């Protein structure tokens, strides 16, 4: 009976590690879908995983809009056609007054 419990425990751990690896990524395009980016958390040794791109109205960070070695840190950029606005830190449709060019 004890051996059966150990076998079930090993099986559960193996399944969990397989699930964790399924969403991992090493670079931007090859591993993630077209509406996702390869994202690493803010902590130094965070694992990378695929996450959705920012939609209109979602939070964003103007400093995380460019990939670092093929992955993003902290937040995915806004999806194509949207820009991350500095005043509100949200993904929005581009306009004359909310593009980054107007701040430089």
From Swiss-Prot:
Name the UniProt record assigns to this protein: Astakine
Signal peptide: 1-22
Keyword 4Fe-4S: no
Chief location of this protein within or outside the cell: secreted
Record keywords: Disulfide bond, Secreted, Signal
One Pfam family it belongs to: Prokineticin
Cysteine pairings via disulfide bonds: 25-38, 32-50, 37-76, 60-84, 78-91
Keyword Disulfide bond: yes
Organism encoding this protein: Pacifastacus leniusculus
Family according to the record: Belongs to the AVIT (prokineticin) family.
GO cellular component annotations of the record: extracellular region
Gene3D superfamilies named among the record's database cross-references: Lipase, subunit A
Compartment(s) of residence: Secreted
